[in-house]
Amino acid sequence: MGNASLDIDHYQHIYTEYAPMLMRFAEKFVSGFFAEDIVHDVFLKLWDKQVFRLPESDLKRVLYVSVRNACLDYLRRMNME
């Protein structure tokens, strides 16, 4: 149980630290509401895959690449409609 609590605390720390930067990054691709939604989705996937356990430098790269790819996927879907 203690380990799960540490995981949640670490995840919350990562979210607090990176989410604002990632939302600004996503807004270069999509509007604010969609940027926020995309960043939240990326963090949910991060939790599911336990990616937050990566070293900080790798984690930052994974987060930015994941957000970029999610934005591009969203734009492709919107373009197809």
Regions found by a protein language model. Name each.
Residues G2-Q12, M23-D41, V51-S57:
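Short, charged helix-capping/linker segments at alpha-helix termini
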Residues A4-S5, Y18-A19, K45:
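Short hydrophobic/aromatic segments of transmembrane alpha-helices and their interfaces
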Residues Y15-A19, Y64:
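Amphipathic, non-transmembrane alpha-helical scaffold segments
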Residues F25, K45, A70, Y74:
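Short alpha-helical functional segments enriched in proximate histidine and acidic residues
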Residues D37-L44, D48, S57-N69:
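Structural recognition of an alpha-helix C-terminal capping motif at a helix-to-coil junction
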Residues V65-E81:
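Arg/Lys-rich amphipathic alpha helix in sigma70-family domain 2
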